[in-house]
Amino acid sequence: MGQSSLKLETIPLNDCHFSDAAPVGSVIPTESEVYDAVAQLWRQEPELERAGWEEWRARLKAIHPGWSLSVAHICRTLEKHCMSITGITQFTYHELVTSKESPALREPHLAKVQVTWSEKGKGLVARRPLAKGELVFAEDALSFIPPLEKSTLVHLSKACGSCGTSLSQNRYYYVMNNLDCDNCTTIWCTKGCRNLDTTHDFLKHPMSRNKRCSAQKWLKFEQFCKENTWHSAYSVGVMFARYYLHSDRRLQGNFESLAEVSQRVRLHAADTMNSGAAFDLGVDLTANAQSVCMWEEGYGLFCDAFPLAKDEYDLDFEKFLRYVGKFNLNQVNGQIYMLLSHLNHSCEPNIYYELEGHHINVYARKEIKSDEELTVSYVNPLHDVDLRRRELRVNWGFLCLCDRCKREISKKNIDKAGHSSTTAGPEPQSYRGHRRKSSLRASKPTLQDLLENGKEFDIEIPSQPGFAARRASVRFDSKVVTAVEERQ
């Protein structure tokens, strides 16, 4: 019987042999493939928004060398899907946004500010000079919306039925302090949270005989929203129940006075094949081609939960979509703050806010003069100008033309012109590796870069409640060493 031994052998990994790859230029991509490729590249590198058609074609060919792709093909595809590369014809909807005068703002909130109207709509200005760091105003949420994602934990008595906070005491503690429901498993963490949950009996107890609301069908609507990550419709339902079931005219008036636009319009701005969905800063994940069908089904469940609302409030499907769009336009961290919703945007804001639960504090970022407009940034001010403007266009319907945006656009155009004048000949092969990546990718290499170069880099592990954020390293190599048995 022969003896065997082990030897080390280096073998290729990650499909390094591409002999079976399609010949260059042999595949004509479909419109969907072109659109998806452009959308992905646009998300990764927003500065390409002002690139020419030939540059886009070169970038797409570099990523998909097997494609037979013409400029005309790219133009036709993007025009068909209402997507413009040049930025000249990008869809905006700010002129479709409407609002009304808020009927019941609390006087203490208006001590340092006052509401004004301009071509931009409602706004806030300072009544008197404000010092840097001064508290401008503070307010609670218009009507606190329980977190939809905590509904299962609430049902299991593991989280507060109002704010969703994890419950730390045993059940006996809550029973003794009258913080439990007599008819279901819901528990509240404090008496304040119990008092906030004014519609609990109507929405959570199937035995309720209220003609205006079917608790059993509300629970179906709630589950539907949870399954489809449709937080805005759920929030509209909670808000509507609060003023509808209690005839709360003040709450109704304040909610209906907020700026609104149909969610159908916002979906159009988000580009129906998902290029804009990645930028949607609302609370939903529903910006896709199947959204309308989901909306119709959800509206049907909403009407089942409130059988008289359609006639009593003329709440047809289009009005329901305007309510959903209203919530997405005005929400901050899943809540509505009345005075904060009056603030207009600036990429160089003069105020900022801090959240404490469902309470918000607004401070002066710098010294503010009397009668000066108060502005806040709707997006991350550290983002690149192209990314900021795209987020604003998709989520709030306008292309920002503030002084900062104009300066940065002008500088980019000058830099681009200077680069073009000093560049001769074809793009080098390392073009894609040396381009500045957008802030979305945080300058991390692509998967293809890793497989080709075997570089080591840090990847982020999502943080979990109660745990500090961690980092880990991962290495990709094109070859590995394996042990092979050799018989002698």
Swiss-Prot record:
Chain segments carrying region Disordered: 415-445
Boundaries of every SET domain copy: 111-379
The enzyme's E.C. designation: 2.1.1.-
SMART domains registered for this protein in UniProt: SET
Keyword S-adenosyl-L-methionine applies: yes
Gene Ontology biological process terms, A to Z: methylation; telomere maintenance
GO cellular component, one term: chromatin
PROSITE patterns in the cross-refs: SET (PS50280)
Subcellular location(s) of the protein: Nucleus; Chromosome; Cytoplasm
Catalytic function, reaction form: L-lysyl-[histone] + S-adenosyl-L-methionine = N(6)-methyl-L-lysyl-[histone] + S-adenosyl-L-homocysteine + H(+)
Keywords: Chromosome, Cytoplasm, Methyltransferase, Nucleus, S-adenosyl-L-methionine, Transferase
Single GO MF descriptor: histone methyltransferase activity
Taxonomy, superkingdom: Eukaryota
Pfam families cross-referenced by the UniProt entry: SET (PF00856)
Major localisation: nucleus
Role according to the record: Histone methyltransferase that monomethylates 'Lys-5', 'Lys-8' and 'Lys-12' of histone H4 (H4K5me1, H4K8me1 and H4K12me1, respectively), thereby controlling gene expression and remodeling chromatin structures.
Family the UniProt entry places it in: Belongs to the class V-like SAM-binding methyltransferase superfamily. Histone-lysine methyltransferase family. SET5 subfamily.
Protein name in UniProt: Histone-lysine N-methyltransferase SET5
Native source species: Eremothecium gossypii (strain ATCC 10895 / CBS 109.51 / FGSC 9923 / NRRL Y-1056) (Yeast)
